[in-house]
């Protein structure tokens, strides 16, 4: 396993992983915010949604 770090720079791998996780998190949040059911800022409370 230690040989892989001779090929890849650990700093670049960690930075790339962090950027990738931020992009995925923002994408998931944007998708959820565009739906009526999961938009917690403009949507109705959960009780109102499930009662209709």
Curated annotation (Swiss-Prot):
It is a single-pass type II membrane protein. Keywords: Antenna complex, Bacteriochlorophyll, Cell inner membrane, Cell membrane, Chlorophyll, Chromophore, Light-harvesting polypeptide, Magnesium, Membrane, Metal-binding, Transmembrane, Transmembrane helix. One of its GO terms (biological process) is photosynthesis, light reaction. The keyword Cell membrane applies. Pfam families: LHC (PF00556). A bacteriochlorophyll binds at residue 29. It is found in: Cell inner membrane. Residues 34-52 are periplasmic. One of its GO terms (molecular function) is metal ion binding. The chain crosses the membrane at residues 13-33. GO terms for cellular component: organelle inner membrane; plasma membrane; plasma membrane light-harvesting complex. SUPFAM superfamilies: Light-harvesting complex subunits. Residues 1-12 are cytoplasmic. Belongs to the antenna complex alpha subunit family. Antenna complexes are light-harvesting systems, which transfer the excitation energy to the reaction centers. The core complex is formed by different alpha and beta chains, binding bacteriochlorophyll molecules, and arranged most probably in tetrameric structures disposed around the reaction center. The non-pigmented gamma chains may constitute additional components. This is Light-harvesting protein B800/830/1020 alpha-1 chain. It comes from Halorhodospira halochloris (Ectothiorhodospira halochloris).
């Amino acid at each position: 396993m230690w040989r892989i770090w001779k090929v890849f720079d650990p700093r670049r791998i960690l930075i790339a992983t962090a950027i990738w996780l931020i992009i995925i998190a923002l994408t998931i949040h944007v998708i959820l915010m565009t739906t009526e059911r999961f938009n917690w800022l403009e949507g109705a409370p959960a009780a109102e949604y499930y009662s209709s």
